[in-house]
Amino acid sequence: MYDVKGNLHEVLGSLPAGVSLVAISKFHPNEFIEAAYAEGQRIFGESHEQELAKKVASLPEDIQWHFIGHLQSNKVKYIAPYISMIESVDSLKLLKEINKQAAKHDRVVKVLLELHIAEEDTKSGLSLDACRELLESGEWREMPHVQICGLMMMASNTDDEQQIASEFDEAAQFFDEVKAKYFADDDAFCERSWGMSHDYHIAVKHGSTMVRVGTTIFGPRIY
């Protein structure tokens, strides 16, 4: 078996105080998750609601599941009963649906607003202006079953570490702007989710409070 235990501790040991780890377990078997769980890891990230449902049914109840992939509004109802955080909110429509479905289960679902800062068109997320527009509308203030806890983004897929760092900096500056304008008195708005296996070491130097690491811990994905 892949050395999940050793890899996990290596990643955790490299994170500064105050940075949490989302172990990205999509396409990895339950025994890998159980190995990380046995070492104290509790936050795991998935991006397919059907795969997630199977894992939720068969793994410990105190795992905090984060949804990290593109989420269609019509799929929210399947994860609303148990999801801990949805990191990939990229529209007001999706936010409304999360609030609606969470209400049915009398839950408050934590969410992050996903930004699109990277150069690739393939990455989803809100442009900075679209994010400002969503927040300016104020509609989210009328959603008692959703708690906006911060921002999420992916840097461009490049070997240029300066570019990656500048994109993380741009996200960090935008976080400060949004925090001051809309969430100054809201301690829950505190998360900056950026950094993955190939660039989390840069992200933690540029404002990240939450890194999403899979391959470095679990090895290549098993499709």
Give the ranges of each region predicted by the language model.
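Gly/Pro- and small hydrophobic-enriched strand-loop and loop-to-helix capping segments
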Residues: S208-Y223
